């Protein structure tokens, strides 16, 4: 019958095709199944931060599954890095240890090594180095053949004032082999760098009193920024040489002084103040650009010749001829030398070496009663008679210093650093 007949070739081909269609439909159903009902499939971990950046929603980070990071444990809780470590998953949350460590028999024997063998190894290690020996009974100290000098004190207990008293500032002039050469060079250069004596008469808008106010202000600037005395002397020299060639309005006189002080600071100081500091001390009267342009103009007028001999340099040489050295004499001579900077008349007509000689003699006579040394007469060629005109003018300036309108120099030398020499009473007369 038909129902019992064997299927023909056509029927088998149709059955095979139907079976293939069923398998294909089954695969499609599995692919289209709801993800919530699907079997958990292990997906590769992705960085949630990238998803947040792409979506632009900062809160999307909470909606996605954050990657699991490994918590850094303290050093004592770190797991042992051993290939024999096994972590049974059914005991991970129990009270028993989460992992067990398999120890080989050789390791057990090494752990059970008796302490005596370790002691033997330690003795062998100590015996290996001849400089190390095992602790034993202490031997008596070997007596010294010479007595130890106990007069020395520890550097930590010594008074710092003792060390400071031994320190002496180094002078570039303290080179005996070159004394004569240095002095000869300075004497030649002071003539070349000397300002014109009557230049103020050709200035249409400034006077000697304005110049005195400017120099007095520069003294305060030098004290404010802890500048060297040589810097002040150089700045005044630059100002006088510049005014000898250029006419300046009174509104620009302070700008000239500021640029001169800036140049002198760069030439003399190790750490000169910045340009902004000089703008600040003028109370922003001038801009930084104006100060720099004036600096350029001053350099051009001076032909970049900044190494001018000053009263301070000659005084430093003359101080070497004191027998004995007297700090108060040196401070008073420096005070008198700076007083000569205030008044252009009459001191512009004297060379710096002459002013320094008069200041040194007047200071020496005021403090000790001594006169111009014979050694300086031989060195400089100046006699007391040749110094007399400048000495008389400087003596009058010294007498009238308390009544002078500009008092910055007197206030400066009241300091204990200069032994308060501005408070000394000047001699009424000079026995010349």
Curated annotation (Swiss-Prot):
Pfam families: Cyclin_C, Cyclin_N, Cyclin_N2
PTM comment: Polyubiquitinated via 'Lys-11'-linked ubiquitin by the anaphase-promoting complex (APC/C), leading to its degradation by the proteasome. Deubiquitinated and stabilized by USP37 enables entry into S phase. Ubiquitinated during the G1 phase by the SCF(FBXO31) complex, leading to its proteasomal degradation.
MF terms (GO), sorted A to Z: cyclin-dependent protein serine/threonine kinase regulator activity; protein domain specific binding; protein kinase binding
In-chain residues carrying the UniProt-annotated modification Phosphoserine: 5, 55
CDD domains hit by this protein: CYCLIN_CCNA2_rpt1, CYCLIN_CCNA2_rpt2
Record region (Disordered): 26-45, 55-75
GO BP annotation list: animal organ regeneration; cell cycle G1/S phase transition; cell division; cellular response to cocaine; cellular response to estradiol stimulus; cellular response to hypoxia; cellular response to insulin-like growth factor stimulus; cellular response to leptin stimulus
Single GO cellular component term: cyclin-dependent protein kinase holoenzyme complex
Residues annotated with N-acetylmethionine modification: 1
Keyword set, alphabetical order: Acetylation, Cell cycle, Cell division, Cyclin, Cytoplasm, Host-virus interaction, Mitosis, Nucleus, Phosphoprotein, Ubl conjugation
Entry's localization field: Nucleus; Cytoplasm
Cited SMART domains: CYCLIN, Cyclin_C
Family stated for the protein in its record: Belongs to the cyclin family. Cyclin AB subfamily.
Record function comment: Cyclin which controls both the G1/S and the G2/M transition phases of the cell cycle. Functions through the formation of specific serine/threonine protein kinase holoenzyme complexes with the cyclin-dependent protein kinases CDK1 or CDK2. The cyclin subunit confers the substrate specificity of these complexes and differentially interacts with and activates CDK1 and CDK2 throughout the cell cycle.
Subunit annotation: Interacts with the CDK1 and CDK2 protein kinases to form serine/threonine kinase holoenzyme complexes. Interacts with CDK1 (hyperphosphorylated form in G1 and underphosphorylated forms in S and G2). Interacts with CDK2; the interaction increases from G1 to G2. Interacts (associated with CDK2 but not with CDK1) with SCAPER; regulates the activity of CCNA2/CDK2 by transiently maintaining CCNA2 in the cytoplasm. Forms a ternary complex with CDK2 and CDKN1B; CDKN1B inhibits the kinase activity of CDK2 through conformational rearrangements. Interacts with INCA1. (Microbial infection) Interacts with human cytomegalovirus protein UL32.
Protein name (database record): Cyclin-A2
